[in-house]
Design a protein with these regions (language model features):
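N-terminal targeting or signal-anchor segments and their processing/structural boundaries
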Residues: 2-685
């Protein structure tokens, strides 16, 4: 169906245009500050070939003719052709015309839809013609039903842009099967999604909205896909998907709506004494107009990634003599097995000569080489065994042999030695000492100890420290913890606890525990620690302080609409989790919240693991439901806040606050403001 969302000029601009026309004759230059108002009207489609709704169409070239010169804006990103095409259509604009030439052969007795969204703009001001689409059929009947809705990212309700939402027709209106397949009817739709392209599809816009045009009567399975390879089917583990649990049966119905035309004058009403002196606008005419009510129109799909990314070795490097960095394309379940084959052609197991520093998902690993024979070698020959995803999608053991060269480090001394000598050199003075008689200076390098969280700690956060290299020795008797009391420093017992994952991090525990608004200091005596390369720790003193209770606010949420199987996250203004609290007895409580601005998100934690979990297509498992509080929370020190939150009171598509949305479509107010500014300069408003 040919549509164009037309915008009427506002009363203000109409009046101002008339005023300007009465005072400024000859202002005919569109968009010129000295030549008239800016053009705000989008192009108007005058004709098309084939015409909208045309049947028995046989040619592959579609022509559109507009009322003014037009241009194309990101047309290949915005164009959607259904049925989906194997070869991309060729789209061109010339003056007032746009042509779309399909490269695939037309299918018989098939309804085609061409959706250009807002890709066509006028040539002067770039006003887009929104909702431009064309429907035609190669047979004598045209299908005209529609399916519409929104696609949101499941974890953060962000609108998903540029994804395909497509359908597979499973059953005719009489219940007979449309597709004969060896799979069972229960899993038919899922199988089609992974094996065949969409039969019809729409593309999501900047708001995540989609519309699938030209649907025939019947029963459908609906999916969404961020298509990584342009084949309109789910065959890459990196692709995000969404699905609807129920089958979709589109419908359309002719309806009428009433438009009231009001009279210019007002009439007094005196139905009762309380109404005396009041006025009502008089109704002039009630006009009825017909429209087609398409259903469904408000579907909400939640996009997710199943997390089944292909595993393979992405990179292995030796940035310096003592490090080996390994990066995998996806998270791993366990560490790889490393064996050194060189130097000296000996097999040395990596566990005995390496210390691994992994990230949380085990896809990025940093190894410290602690054996001097290895880190002094110019070349390391390394054998690595790890899980690799094969062509069948299975994770199987794979062994690679990797050669790593020690990088050449160019110092200033090296550079000076490489420089050619100029002239004859200077003459040695009588009092100069010969180079061979000079005594070289002994330079001792020390390892470093620093705080992870800085000098000011939030209440309840234990102080953590990090050393510059893994430790070989640590004498806790040479570590001293003190707290400040008035002008004195009082000794305290301490525990120095190594991190179970990060080999260079330690947690400091005190007895008794750390107190708010209290200053502490940790002193390490000389040689209290020594790293695996023999570097000692110089005498070090680090001071830190825990914040005062008066630095915080507190907030209590009263949750409605979900059970206790949920948790709430306080979010920063950049949509990042700051704190998390479990919903208990309909409440989520946050204490010791630093002052500032926050937002809130709730996750229905179905498996009670304290984190968001994506869905699973084969298990028909949707991602865990997420809700946003459409409100900014301003937390002040010492204040206690309460907030009632019915998570289902607001439509899901309207829950996420605009301030934390990443995808923010540009508001179309610029040209109105330009006209107002232009007239204001002329003194007309």
């Amino acid at each position: 169906m040919l549509t164009a969302d037309k915008r009427d000029k506002s009363a203000l601009i109409v009046c101002l245009s008339a005023l300007l026309g009465a005072t400024l004759s000859g202002c005919a230059s569109i968009g010129s500050p000295g030549g008239g108002l800016y053009d705000e009207d989008p192009p108007v489609l005058r004709s098309s070939d084939p015409k909208d709704g045309g049947t028995n169409v046989s040619k592959q070239k579609i022509s559109l003719h507009f009322n003014e010169n037009v241009k194309l804006n990101n047309v290949m990103d915005k164009l959607t052709v259904s049925p989906p095409q194997e070869k991309s259509a060729v789209v061109q604009s010339n003056a007032k015309n746009v042509t779309i030439e399909l490269q695939d052969s037309l299918r018989p007795n098939t309804t085609y839809s061409i959706d250009l969204a807002d890709a066509v703009q006028d040539n002067n001001e770039g006003n887009p013609m929104e909702g431009l689409s064309l429907l035609f059929s190669t047979g004598d009947h045209i299908d005209s039903m529609q399916i519409a809705g929104f696609l949101l990212n499941a974890e953060d309700l962000e609108p998903v842009t540029g994804a395909y939402v497509g359908i597979y027709r499973l059953f005719e209106p009489d219940g007979s099967a449309c597709i004969k397949d060896s799979v069972t009817a229960e899993s038919l739709g899922d199988s089609l999604f992974m094996r065949y392209p969409f039969e019809r599809a729409g593309k999501t816009d900047a708001y995540g909205a989609f519309k699938i045009l030209g649907c025939a009567p019947g029963t459908y399975k609906l999916f969404a896909l961020t298509d990584g390879n342009g084949n309109y089917k789910y065959d890459l583990t990196s692709e995000n998907i969404a699905f609807v649990d129920t089958l979709i049966v589109p419908s359309m119905e002719n309806r009428q709506k009433a438009d009231t035309v009001w009279a210019d004058s007002q009439v007094a009403t005196a139905r009762d004494s309380s109404a005396l002196g009041t006025t009502e606008r008089a109704i002039d005419t009630i006009r009825y107009s017909g429209y087609i009510d398409y259903k469904p129109t408000g579907l909400v799909l939640l996009s997710f990634n199943e997390g089944k990314r292909n595993r393979y070795l992405d990179d292995c490097s030796r940035p310096d003599s003592i490090h080996i960095n390994v990066r995998f394309a996806a998270g791993m379940d366990s560490l790889p097995k490393l064996t050194f084959l060189a130097p000296d052609s000996l097999r040395v197991e990596g566990d005995s000569v390496l210390i691994c520093e992994p990230n949380a998902t085990l896809d990025t690993l940093s190894y410290w080489i602690k054996d001097s024979v290895l880190y002094c070698a110019d070349t390391l020959l390394l054998e690595m065994t790890y899980l690799h995803t094969d062509t069948a999608g299975l994770d199987v053991p794979c062994t690679d042999t990797i050669s790593l060269l020690k990088p050449i480090v160019r110092t200033q001394t090296n550079a000076k030695q490489d420089e050619p000598k100029k002239g004859k050199g200077r003459r040695r003075r009588k009092n100069d000492k010969a180079d061979e008689d000079s005594v070289p200076k002994i330079v001792i390098t020390y390892m470093e100890l620093k705080q992870v969280y800085g000098q000011t700690l939030d209440i309840g956060k234990k102080p953590r420290f990090e050393v510059s290299a893994p430790l070989a020795e640590c004498d806790t008797r040479k570590l001293h913890l003190q707290r400040q009391q008035d002008s004195l420093w009082i000794d305290m017992p301490l525990q120095w606890v190594p991190d179970s994952i990060h080999p260079r991090r330690f947690t400091l525990l005190a007895d008794p525990h750390f107190n708010p608004a209290t200053a502490y200091r940790l002193t390490a005596d000389s040689a209290a620690m020594k790293d695996i390369y023999g570097q000692p720790l110089n005498s070090t003193t680090i001071e830190f302080k825990e914040r005062s209770i008066d630095d915080y606010g507190h907030i209590l949420f009263y949750i409605q609409g979900v059970t206790d199987e949920a948790f709430v996250q306080l979010l920063s203004t950049k949509d990042q989790p700051i704190q998390q609290a479990k919903v208990q007895n309909g409440q989520a409580k946050f204490v010791h919240v630093p002052t500032g601005s926050y937002f809130a998100r709730l996750v229905v934690d179905s498996n009670r693991n304290g984190k968001f979990d994506a869905g699973n297509l084969k298990l028909h498992q949707q991602p865990e439901q997420v809700y946003y509080l459409n409100l900014k929370l301003e937390i002040r020190a010492t204040w206690n806040y309460t907030q009632t939150w019915d998570v289902t009171a607001t439509e899901l598509t309207k829950q996420k606050p605009e301030e934390v949305k990443i995808n923010k479509p540009k508001e179309k107010k610029e040209k109105v403001s330009k006209n107002e500014e232009y007239l204001r300069k002329l003194g007309k408003i």
